[in-house]
């Protein structure tokens, strides 16, 4: 006798910011005996190996933005081709529900599911709803949010909004209860610097110049771990080697980033939704530099959720100078109580069972519309 087990199609853009929470949901669904397939774009190759999907469907995708009408028209044509691919995949997989985590690669499969009357659930990770999710929200049965307050949700969809939190990766949950590292006069100062899943050149430009400005006694205690883009790596390492730091490790990518976050006294980073949620989960203070230039300013809104409770400093990139960063580092490292208080404040914003909450929502939505 064949036992039917439902399948959920999870859709996410191919970068860590979208894939990490999608991955966390996938693990939670599989723990309930629900099969998972993933629809995404070609960028997924570098991080797809850890995704617990029985099938990965690559969908043609593009972002219809910019001033060039030709480029925008080309993007629309690409999305149209992706819609055809997605519609065939949805018919073949016959999912009980389709869950979208944002980014334009989610538009073709989510729209295909809505037109084929398959229940859809949106998850918005940021404190400002993205344009792709805003477009899809009208046809979704449920809109789950990572933050309690989210700007930009279409008015007609607000009644279907449920705050679940952002799903946290198992590797983060594994270190979430790590106590804040002891910090006293003369002890090592552990600073972690990273720029998100794709790195950030500004960190390689500003942070070394700021470290040079620190008093020598602080530099001697500083143990620095920094993510640097491959093209910046050698120059960044060489600058640090001349500073007399207590320790330095730089690399383009750290697979064990959650463990390094748990070991840090302070984190300097961008403020993507996953980063902000993981800082809260582990309880680590941060200096956050929101990605500039975004029309919706979503990273600034994300950073504000921690800054408003005293868990982080949010510095616009235009004000993120070596002098400003050096001054903030001296202020925090010379007053350890500020760091421990910020660490405790960060934990007040965490939702460790967000993946289970979202999995329950997905299962209930699929059952209610089957």
Curated annotation (Swiss-Prot):
One GO process term, biological-process aspect: lipid glycosylation
Family (UniProt): Belongs to the glycosyltransferase 28 family. MurG subfamily.
Binding site for UDP-N-acetyl-alpha-D-glucosamine: 15-17, 126, 169, 197, 299
Top-level taxon: Bacteria
Pathway: Cell wall biogenesis; peptidoglycan biosynthesis
Documented EC number(s): 2.4.1.227
Localization of this protein: Cell inner membrane
Presence of keyword Isomerase: no
One Pfam entry name: Glyco_tran_28_C
Bilayer topology annotation: Peripheral membrane protein
Catalytic activity, reaction form: di-trans,octa-cis-undecaprenyl diphospho-N-acetyl-alpha-D-muramoyl-L-alanyl-D-glutamyl-meso-2,6-diaminopimeloyl-D-alanyl-D-alanine + UDP-N-acetyl-alpha-D-glucosamine = di-trans,octa-cis-undecaprenyl diphospho-[N-acetyl-alpha-D-glucosaminyl-(1->4)]-N-acetyl-alpha-D-muramoyl-L-alanyl-D-glutamyl-meso-2,6-diaminopimeloyl-D-alanyl-D-alanine + UDP + H(+)
An example Gene Ontology CC term for this record: plasma membrane
Biological role: Cell wall formation. Catalyzes the transfer of a GlcNAc subunit on undecaprenyl-pyrophosphoryl-MurNAc-pentapeptide (lipid intermediate I) to form undecaprenyl-pyrophosphoryl-MurNAc-(pentapeptide)GlcNAc (lipid intermediate II).
Protein name per the record: UDP-N-acetylglucosamine--N-acetylmuramyl-(pentapeptide) pyrophosphoryl-undecaprenol N-acetylglucosamine transferase
Keywords tagged on the record: Cell cycle, Cell division, Cell inner membrane, Cell membrane, Cell shape, Cell wall biogenesis/degradation, Glycosyltransferase, Membrane, Peptidoglycan synthesis, Transferase
Record-linked InterPro entries: GlcNAc_MurG, Glyco_trans_28_C, GlycoTrans_28_N
Broad class of where this protein is predominantly found: membrane
């Amino acid at each position: 006798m064949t036992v039917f087990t439902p399948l959920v199609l999870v859709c996410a853009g191919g970068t860590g910011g979208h894939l990490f929470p999608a991955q966390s949901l996938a693990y939670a669904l599989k723990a309930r005996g629900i099969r998972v397939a993933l629809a995404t774009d070609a960028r997924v190759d570098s991080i797809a190996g850890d995704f617990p999907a029985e099938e990965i469907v690559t969908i043609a995708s593009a972002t219809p933005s910019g001033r060039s009408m030709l480029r925008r028209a080309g993007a629309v044509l690409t999305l149209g081709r992706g819609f055809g691919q997605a519609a065939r995949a949805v018919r073949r997989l016959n999912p009980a529900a389709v869950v979208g985590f944002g980014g334009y690669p989610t538009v073709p499969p989510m729209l295909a599911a809505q037109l084929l009357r398959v229940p859809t659930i949106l998850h918005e990770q940021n404190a400002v709803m993205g344009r792709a999710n805003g477009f899809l929200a009208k046809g979704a049965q449920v809109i789950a949010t990572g933050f309690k307050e989210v700007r930009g949700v279409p008015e007609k969809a607000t009644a279907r909004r449920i705050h679940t939190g952002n799903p946290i990766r198992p590797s983060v949950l594994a270190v979430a209860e790590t106590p804040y590292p002891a910090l006293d006069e003369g002890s090592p100062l552990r600073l972690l610097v990273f720029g998100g899943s794709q790195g950030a050149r500004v960190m390689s430009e500003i942070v070394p110049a700021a470290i040079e400005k620190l008093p020598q006694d602080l530099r001697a205690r500083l143990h620095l771990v920094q993510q640097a883009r491959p093209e910046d790596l050698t120059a960044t390492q060489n600058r640090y080697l001349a500073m007399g730091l207590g320790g330095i490790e730089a690399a383009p990518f750290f697979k064990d980033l959650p463990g390094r976050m748990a070991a840090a006294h302070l984190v300097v980073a961008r403020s993507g939704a996953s980063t902000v949620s993981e800082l809260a989960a582990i309880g680590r203070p941060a200096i956050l530099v929101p990605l500039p230039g975004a029309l919706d300013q979503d990273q600034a809104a994300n950073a504000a959720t921690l800054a408003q409770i005293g868990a982080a400093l949010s510095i616009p990139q235009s004000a993120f100078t070596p002098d400003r960063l050096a001054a903030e580092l001296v202020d925090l490292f010379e007053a350890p109580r500020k760091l421990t208080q910020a660490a405790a404040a960060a934990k007040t914003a965490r939702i460790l069972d967000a993946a289970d909450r979202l999995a329950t929502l997905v299962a209930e939505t699929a059952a209610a519309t089957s």
